[in-house]
Amino acid sequence: MKRFMTLLLAMLMVLSLAACGDKSSATVDAEGLGKALAERVQFDSTMSIIDAGDYLELPEGSSAAAFMSDGSTMEEIFVVSCKDKTDASAVKIAMQSLLDSQKQEAERYQPEEAERLGSAVFGTYGTCVVLCVTSDTDTANAVIKEYVG
């Protein structure tokens, strides 16, 4: 009986530790999050679906959603869900490079857009990388939190 109780307690401990595992590595629905951002966040221009692969080199096995402004603003959404953190890190570097080049261009011709690019919501959530260029950053962060926990 004493052995059984020891085994039972050990199993309960393992299960409770597993419940505290890294939830940030859970797969994020890139299309769902991208669509939710496009629909719920306030943008100054109409957002249209684009092919993320036209702007970023996407790793094999990743899924992506991307939207860009139809107007003269630099508002955009990129959501890329990768198969592992190594791929997510590479995507984040590529997104940062894209963002930096856009900022540099905007500083010359659209200073107000450079400011918006500078305050973009940009981060890695486990294996998902999100970039949302908008003035409505509070809503964007809330929507992202719903999807990534």
Predicted segments with their positions:
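Sec-dependent signal peptide recognition
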Residues: 2-10
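Short Gly/Thr-rich strand-loop-strand
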Residues: 85-125
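Bacterial signal peptide processing site
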Residues: 21-23
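Short, compositionally biased low-complexity segments enriched in polar/charged residues
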Residues: 45-74, 86-90, 112, 117-120
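C-terminal motif of bacterial Sec signal peptides marking the signal peptidase cleavage site
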Residues: 15-19
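A short, solvent-exposed beta-edge/loop patch
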Residues: 112-149
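Post-signal peptide N-terminal segment of mature Sec-exported envelope proteins
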Residues: 28-46
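Second-shell loop/turn segments in exported
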Residues: 76-84, 128-133
